[in-house]
Structure formats: C-alpha cells, structure tokens
Amino acid sequence: MKNASTVSEDTASNQEPTLHRGLHNRHIQLIALGGAIGTGLFLGIGPAIQMAGPAVLLGYGVAGIIAFLIMRQLGEMVVEEPVSGSFAHFAYKYWGPFAGFLSGWNYWVMFVLVGMAELTAAGIYMQYWFPDVPTWIWAAAFFIIINAVNLVNVRLYGETEFWFALIKVLAIIGMIGFGLWLLFSGHGGEKASIDNLWRYGGFFATGWNGLILSLAVIMFSFGGLELIGITAAEARDPEKSIPKAVNQVVYRILLFYIGSLVVLLALYPWVEVKSNSSPFVMIFHNLDSNVVASALNFVILVASLSVYNSGVYSNSRMLFGLSVQGNAPKFLTRVSRRGVPINSLMLSGAITSLVVLINYLLPQKAFGLLMALVVATLLLNWIMICLAHLRFRAAMRRQGRETQFKALLYPFGNYLCIAFLGMILLLMCTMDDMRLSAILLPVWIVFLFMAFKTLRRK
C-alpha cells in the first residue's frame, strides 16, 4: 500500500483529477467553527446543565483545554504533511496499517453519526414552527439539499460553510449582547439575575460528581474541531493557514460557549432548563420574545445544517484518503473534474440517509442514541491523534528535523489528554444513556480488526 502523499503525486503526474487546493484561511477557520458550533451547544447543552448546574461553565473550560492540546498536536503533524486523510494518514504512517485503518474508518463512522444527529436536531428545530410535521420528513429534505451543494465543488462548499458559520458566529455574539442587555436593563423578567449562578444550591449545585459526569456530554460539543486536519489537503498555504486556524478556533469556541452559557444561566434558573429542547429558544420564548425566539431558532437550524455540511465534506475526504492508502475500495479514489471525490461522497450519503428510517422508527429517542454513539467514537479518534503524535515526534527526532508548529507540553500533554479521554469513557459506563455506546466501542474495534485482517489476506 502506498501512503497518501505518494499516491497524490502519482495521480497528479498522470494528469488525473485530484483534490483542489481551493480553501483559504477564512474558509478553514469557519469550517472548524462550523463543525463544532452546532447541536452540542444549542441542544446538547441542556443535559449537561441538568447534570452539573452552573459548574457546567468549569466543565467547558476543562474540556476546552484538552481540546486545544489535541488540536495543537494535530496541527503540528498537518503543517509538516498537509495530505488527504488527516490523522488517519499519520496513524497509518507512524503506527502501522491497522492504526490507519482504525482511525480512518472510525472517523468516517463518527461523522456519519454526527450527520444523523444534526439532521435529527434540524427536524426537532423545525417542529418549533411546524409541530405536526414529523422529524423524518425534515431530515430527508435537508439531506437532499446539503448533499446537492457538496456535489458541485470544494470552493462552493467552502463558501457555503463560510456563510453558514458566519451566520452562527454573528448570531451568538448578538445573542450574548442581547442577553446582557436584558440582564442589566431589567427587561429580562423577574427571574433574570446574575445570582442565578449560585442561588439554587450554589455554583457546584450537584457536587463534583455531577460536574465530572457532565464532561461526557460536554465532549459532544467539541467534536468537529479536528476538521482543521481534514482541510489540509485542500488548503492554500497550509503552513500559515493551519496554525492560525488551530490557535484562533479553540479560543473562539470557548468564548462563544462560556459566554453563551453565562448569559443563559443568568437569565433563567438552571433548575428549570429542560433537556429535550433548545434552552436558548425556550428562554426567549418564555420571556415573551417570540420574534427573537423564532430568529434564534432559525440560527440554531442553520447551525445544525452547517455541522452536517462540514460532515459531508469531511467524510468524503476521509474515505478518499482511506482508498488512497489501500484501506478502502479503489473506486472511492475517483475525483470529478471539479475536484470532488464523487464516489466517496455518494457512499457516505447513502449510509447517512438511514437517519430518515431511524427518525421514523424512534422519533423520541433518536437524538440521544446518536449523541452517545458520537461521543464514544470521538474519544477513540482523539486518543488516536494523541498516540499518532507521539510516534510522529519520535520519527522527527530520529530524522533530526525541527517541526514548524510545535504542540504544547509534549509529551506530558499527550498522556494527560489520553488519561482524560479514558476517564470519560469509564464515566460513560456508569451512565444509563451512554453505557451501551461505551460497551459497543471495544466491540467496534474488534470488528474493524477482523475486517482489516480479512482484507489483508485477500
């Protein structure tokens, strides 16, 4: 099997279609923001608040630090080798064929599940306006629209995601500003007060146990940041754009998440936040700001579609990279004249379309089930990034090479992140809603190992 960079060169020399470097720095930053700011913030935050109370703010801070360390590790590798397949390429090259096979297919499955979760959430948001229309109809409609956009070319995808993400970012800034105005102008109602952060049982209202358990749900909110690595093969000037994206994206995510949460928890008592709807829409609806609530619901809908849009992009590129490595069927390397990995895109879409059936059969449980499965696969992906980076740095040291964009706290940071992610996985085993996904993870790894061995024998 050839590595990704070698095959890319061979393909180019034969003048066959390859992935186009059509993404600028602004695209990359907002693609990563678009992949992370979505249902995890607007819908998934409800269960986290119920578990941790106001201390959920601390939970997001801790998870954000871990996410930043891992993204710096990924960023260091990507700047040195900006190839298709991202961390699956590095796992393959520096750990071995099975590590690349495991990383790539696990990431692909994760973003298929993310896509299903976001389409499910989009259907839930649409029920705010059309309560009688089932979620599966909306999931099917948005599935068709987003995949059609991605079939055109990477530049159109980048522009679409840029505007999707920009709408989200501006809306979050506006929501924080409007919330602060409501809070300090007296227009936020009788319940609005900064005292809400400690009035109902204190800041650690559910104790340290509640805070620690909430981390399993909080991790869902940070999934998608690794899209920075996926964009590398189509980034213009990756040596400059990737470091900027890595450094700025995590800061902005933390600002948006923690800023939004402070406003949310101050405007409304955390004990009244529900887990089955968007807390943000609920608060403005209860404040009789129906116009604002509808506008915010529209933004939240865009947020979900944005994350799914990012997932369609990343999944097709990951499959392309797997095929280049020899870890997926060769027909998936086919690239259209416009630079779109067409067969990879179509296969990913075909599997994601099962979300329509899931929402039809399990309309009330679909989102919770999908979120738990996403968290389990996300933990494995990030652990593989940390492990691949350890081998990458060892290889650089043997070659006497100095990297341009160094990860922080190496190697202690790698082991810290692995221990943290392992702790989250153990916590999931104690939670009724997440236990199944944690148990299925080792089964999934064994299945992939057997599939890998079978393919190698053939």
Swiss-Prot record:
Consequence the record notes for mutating E226 to A/Q/K/R/W: Loss of activity
Effect on the protein upon substituting Y92L: 41% of wild-type phenylalanine transport activity
Substitution effect: P54L: 26% of wild-type phenylalanine transport activity
Topology versus the membrane: Multi-pass membrane protein
Organism: Escherichia coli (strain K12)
Key word Transmembrane present: yes
Resulting phenotype, P442A: 46% of wild-type phenylalanine transport activity
Ranges facing Periplasmic side: 49-50, 127-132, 182-196, 272-288, 363-367, 433-434
Any Gene Ontology CC annotation: plasma membrane
TM helices/strands, residue ranges: 28-48, 51-71, 106-126, 133-153, 161-181, 197-217, 251-271, 289-309, 342-362, 368-388, 412-432, 435-455
Reactions performed catalytically: L-phenylalanine(in) + H(+)(in) = L-phenylalanine(out) + H(+)(out)
NCBIfam families recorded: PRK10249.1 (NF007602)
Outcome (variant: F90L): 65% of wild-type phenylalanine transport activity
Chain's role: Permease that is involved in the active transport across the cytoplasmic membrane of phenylalanine. Can also transport tyrosine, but not tryptophan.
Effect noted on mutating F111Y: Enables the transport of tryptophan to almost the same steady-state level as that of phenylalanine
Entry superkingdom: Bacteria
Database matches in PANTHER family: GABA PERMEASE (PTHR43495), PHENYLALANINE-SPECIFIC PERMEASE (PTHR43495:SF3)
Outcome (variant: W105L): 39% of wild-type phenylalanine transport activity
Cellular localization per UniProt: Cell inner membrane
GO biological process, one term: amino acid transport
Effect of W108L: 71% of wild-type phenylalanine transport activity
Name the UniProt record assigns to this protein: Phenylalanine-specific permease
